[in-house]
From Swiss-Prot:
This is NAD(P)H-quinone oxidoreductase subunit H, chloroplastic. GO terms for cellular component: chloroplast thylakoid membrane. It comes from the Eukaryota. It is a peripheral membrane protein. It comes from Sorghum bicolor (Sorghum). Pfam families: Complex1_49kDa (PF00346).
């Protein structure tokens, strides 16, 4: 009996879904010819919770605790975009002190997100030591968050018009101490990782994206800047107080997994520079614009001032979203996080569209892994840096 050797026997392998604390509930259906990847189909939706529809049935203040469940490793950014949307829609002014506090919290959150990308990324490549190092630094950031907000994760700290509470006494000194310590940690990472020949063999030239491809696919964040495009919303479209600080956009021109690693490590250095400047320059004054708490809903004449008979409790301070639409965006650790908001003169948004960076960056994965080896899938997927909470929403 002779077997035909002309037909290639392809193998279909399911990768994932993994636990949300690891790579997330992403399923990849991979078609293999030996160890060569022929095709890859991502299956999404395992963590879909209807976040956009929930927003349309809540006021913004009621919805704030939900948004930290999008990207649960960079929760300050989801809170920032949620309060920025109604602030821009209603032209609510932010006190300068509140803006500086927001910048400090956002950059600390950026560092924490990049750290928790770096550790598992290195573990995927077989390097276990950095995985334990990053948790040491991340723990210090979470201690700062806990002292300022009361929560290590899911902070619920941002408010429309400012922040929930001022920074406690001595917090800024601890923050500066962390900055000095962390800069030494970044040097340690680079000595341990960047010049490691085994690491370079795994990432150099793997997952190449040209600048033109990155723009055509709509990529953002480190994925875009690693392909030679110097696009950072903190410089291009400044928000909060970023235009008052001296820092540089981190970018590389190689477009491979190594370039994306170098961009994120460079961003951690720049975040420290921004935090140090913000702490030194932070002005005094209020930390919240209390005008945003005014309840502006007009009385209904049909009730004839008898509302109190039908209300079980006094309504919380809120305001109506005027009948207009806008798109706001921030530079999150993974890319451009945006909100398309449509108001219709009611307390609830008529439309709340989330533009998650991870969802759009993930679309290029099948193209990147084709004609690569099976082991390169985890390298490429790790270099994209996705969180399924924001991908599936």
């Amino acid at each position: 009996m002779s077997l035909s050797l002309k037909r290639k026997d392809l193998m279909i392998v399911n990768m994932g879904p993994q636990h949300p604390s690891m790579h997330g509930v992403l399923r990849l259906i991979v078609t293999l010819d030996g160890e060569d990847v022929i095709d890859c189909e991502p299956i999404l939706g395992y963590l879909h919770r209807g976040m956009e529809k929930i927003a349309e049935n809540r006021s913004i203040i009621q919805y704030l605790p939900y948004v930290t469940r999008w990207d649960y490793l960079a929760t300050m950014f989801t809170e920032a975009i949620t309060v920025n949307a109604p602030e821009f829609l209603e032209n609510i002014q932010i006190p300068q002190r509140a803006s500086y506090i927001r910048v400090i919290m956002l950059e600390l959150s950026r560092i924490a997100s990049h750290l928790l990308w770096l550790g598992p990324f290195m573990a995927d490549l077989g390097a276990q030591t950095p995985f334990f190092y990053i948790f040491r630094e991340r723990e210090l950031i979470y201690d700062l968050f806990e002292a300022a907000t009361g929560m290590r994760m899911m902070h619920n700290y941002f408010r429309i018009g400012g922040v929930a509470a001022d920074l406690p006494y001595g917090w800024m000194d601890k923050c500066l101490d962390f900055c000095d310590y962390f800069l030494q940690g970044v040097v340690e990472y680079q000595q341990l990782i960047t010049r490691n020949p085994i690491f370079l063999e795994r990432v150099e030239g793997v997952g190449f994206i040209s600048g033109e491809e990155a723009v055509n696919w709509g990529l953002s964040g480190p994925m875009l800047r690693a392909s030679g495009i110097q696009w950072d919303l903190r410089k291009i479209d400044p928000y909060e107080s970023y235009n008052q600080f001296d820092w540089k956009v981190q970018w590389q021109k190689e477009g491979d997994s190594l370039a994306r690693y170098l961009v994120r490590v460079g961003e951690m250095r720049e975040s420290i520079k921004i935090i140090q400047q913000a702490v030194e320059k932070i002005p005094g004054g209020p930390y919240e614009n209390l005008e945003a708490r005014r309840f502006k809903k007009a009385k209904n004449p049909e009730w004839n001032d008898f509302e109190y008979r039908f209300l079980g409790k006094k309504p919380s301070p809120n305001f109506e979203l005027s009948k207009q639409e806008l798109y706001v965006r921030v530079e999150a650790p993974k890319g451009e996080l945006g909100i398309y908001l449509v108001g219709d003169d009611s307390l609830f948004p008529w439309r709340w569209k989330i533009r998650p960076p991870g969802f759009i960056n993930l679309q290029i994965l099948p193209q990147l892994v084709k004609k690569m080896k099976l082991a390169d899938i985890m390298t490429i997927l790790g270099s994209i840096d996705i969180i399924m909470g924001e991908v599936d929403r």
